[in-house]
């Protein structure tokens, strides 16, 4: 194997290397900031490869696991949850050559991690000094936190607007003398020789590292994963730029920074140390020497079989879960409970979020004349939201799409002035508390004034943290502000545009006939305190925001007389007595707040009946949830207990969020009505018989289903390997950059994913890491056509990152196997 130096490389060869860099960067999944924290598939850049192949690759490059330990599966087998039939069927589908005895023998073997790709920084780690490997990560992380600060820091890193991320880091490192503390005495002198241009610095670093080009992809990926949190942040910036047709190279610069650090460490390493590192590196790249099991004679085939057995165990657990669902789906319309032959009294639309499944089930049981609908929580409105008096808008639709319209906050301009004045005073007070001149005397001079608030927070008397739109406003002022639908440039929509949008909303909801007198559109949000990841509990379809804005805008649109008149021409006749009402479902307390009732026109007796049904459903839902959260549930005053959890600033588990999610069902509601799905299924109402051109099906499979998969795999990754794909211990979180993210403790890499407390109750896992099983009641040919026409969906299904199942007219699920082969599922 040969390597080329910078002087020997042609322009084409240089471009090829840069292309390898960019491809390595695309292997990293993005992470959204805390104020819009949405779930992301942490394996997004790897879905072009089969599931088990990625499992081996992650284990061998960075020591990351893609599967639960064997003990977890063994417990399920011992408890009878996973049967021998489940194991045998999974083996038959994935690798018929593997017998049941082989699986059980492997189950008894403790899985040994493969040696991760060796890094030169590890060769300098000594017991009598801080680890060089940790120092490098810490130095990069501190710089990145300063560079990307979003208003948290009072002392800012000086930077030039035109300078690149790499150029800023180089200047920062030249004046930072901390490397000497870990024995790197000559870093500054070596760094002076590094070119200030990022691409030139890249080739300087590669000359020092001196790796054959064939080994670069694995090496580059491994380096990025050592700073995976900040790499994910830069990938987010790259992703956002791509949505707007722009280019962004911070992630490339970050990888070059990491490569330069490797080169600097190589220059500080003794000749013997370099030789030792290169010997280990050569062994790692030699398949005959790479060992992933206790036996030194392990071969590539046995390692592949071990990984395949791990996937067989996972597939068997998923089969066991689906068995419980399959039996419930096997019904005819006449078999479903409480089928309405007449006009329903209320139709209530909720987000497909798994938490809504519990509330919908209890609401339907509380009011037999009521129907519920499942739909993505942004209600099909591609909008952003701009507060009055502000110029920047926030996203209120899925992060995969750009907004087409704007919800503009309107009301008395004086309210916006009051808000600005109060927030300005708050900012001044905060600066006074934290500034270098006053911070040391602040506690002595003003500390006693905080005693009442400390007591209120500690005893749960204080309200939960305010939603993003509430700071600076009184409740009365908030009630006087309303969102108004406008164009992105602020112009008014024509009636035709409103009718087009209203038609899309109604057809997406499946509401084109038989309207109830009251149609409730309920967005959802949460109410927690001292929780940096609060947005992760809000609506993912609304970009990590509460869905009340979308619900209010949709209601205004659908109650407008001119819009209803235009809908008649589209074949949708809304009765004159039908009124749409907006609501907000608080998933922490399971309280439903009805919004803008002064504009609803609902009769008092109708309102009273609806309020009573919502209250009763909330009580039953709270009791069901609190059993999994509290050792003792107050059945008399569960609402107070749930509210206290949201207000308690020491509470690390105010709610379980979407823990337990494992299924997605797109079918008519009668198919699932009355089924107890345990808050584990995303429920999207869909009837293919009313979807003539299957446009709604296409939207469901390429938007809500993808979002559900992202959520599912975020929870999966955070559970199977919280060190690499999770956020660690929530108690130790410190916010970085205002809204950028969190670190664990006082240093280290940016953490991604979910904290352990969101997945584990201290004794057992509350999330069962299973790949999503998506049930769709639609013709197989149409499902196959959509899969074939959507690259991401195709990769997710064909490479086994999720399961897709068709429900036939008899209620029998058929699962899609390799090469598009559909087979009936056991019931």
UniProtKB/Swiss-Prot annotation:
It is a peripheral membrane protein. Changing residue 353 to A: DAB2 no longer restores CAfree growth, still binds Zn(2+). The keyword Transmembrane helix does not apply. It comes from the Bacteria. Uptake of inorganic carbon by cells in the presence of thiosulphate is fully inhibited by the uncouplers carbonyl cyanide m-chlorophenyl hydrazone (CCCP), carbonyl cyanide p-trifluoromethoxyphenyl hydrazone (FCCP), S13 or SF6847. Not inhibited by the ATPase inhibitor N,N-dicyclohexylcarbodiimide (DCCD). Inorganic carbon uptake is inhibited by the ionophore CCCP, suggesting uptake is coupled to a cation gradient. Pfam families: DabA (PF10070). GO terms for molecular function: zinc ion binding. One of its GO terms (cellular component) is plasma membrane. Changing residue 539 to A: DAB2 no longer restores CAfree growth. Disruption phenotype: Required for growth in ambient air. Its cofactor is Zn(2+). It is found in: Cell inner membrane. Keywords: Cell inner membrane, Cell membrane, Membrane, Metal-binding, Transport, Zinc. Zn(2+) binds at residues 351, 353, 524, 539. Its main location: membrane. Belongs to the inorganic carbon transporter (TC 9.A.2) DabA family. PANTHER family: INORGANIC CARBON TRANSPORTER SUBUNIT DABA-RELATED (PTHR38344:SF1), UPF0753 PROTEIN AQ_863 (PTHR38344). Part of an energy-coupled inorganic carbon pump; its substrate may be carbon dioxide. Expression of both dabA2 and dabB2 (DAB2) restores growth in ambient air to E.coli deleted of its carbonic anhydrase genes (called CAfree, deletion of 'can' and 'cynT'); neither dabA2 or dabB2 alone is sufficient. Rescue is pH-independent, suggesting it transports CO(2) and not carbonate ions. Together the genes allow greater than normal uptake of inorganic carbon by E.coli. Uptake of carbon dioxide rather than bicarbonate has been suggested based on kinetic calculations. Forms a complex with DabB2, possibly a heterodimer. This is Probable inorganic carbon transporter subunit DabA2.
